[in-house]
Amino acid sequence: MCGILFCSWKKKSQINKKIVHQSLNLLKNRGPDNSKLIFRENWSMGHTRLSIIDPNSKKSNQPFTDEEGRYFLTFNGEIYNYKKLKLNLVSRGFKFRTNSDTEVLYILLKNFTIESVLNLIKGMFAFVFFDKKENSFIAARDHFGQKPLYYSI
């Protein structure tokens, strides 16, 4: 069980960092092993981690991104078939730096349509995936809602 947070604003001047920090602090009981909050131009993403898969790797902490820094992922849950998906991706030439299901989900979302990703992954999950270049995000949860995803527009 982890906690995820994503906020966006029309203008940078609307950001209230104190409220965002307080919001993430409310989620700390969902993920006591690590907590991280990032702020960018007009958005913020946070995560509180309960380390189950790849527990000793700081590289698996979230929000998750790569060297390019275009995409960001905050994810709660477990992808049951991530090892099989990872083997398939490795056979296609994709490189990994962690042993986490988070990175598998990240690479899938970065390279394939959301529809195909949701059809491929099996598990319980909620996530937000942000594309910095397009200034757009995708929020999704598993089909049964085992992992909650609350949002407001």
Label the model's feature ranges.
Residues M1-I153:
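N-terminus-centric sequence/structural signature that marks the extreme N-terminus
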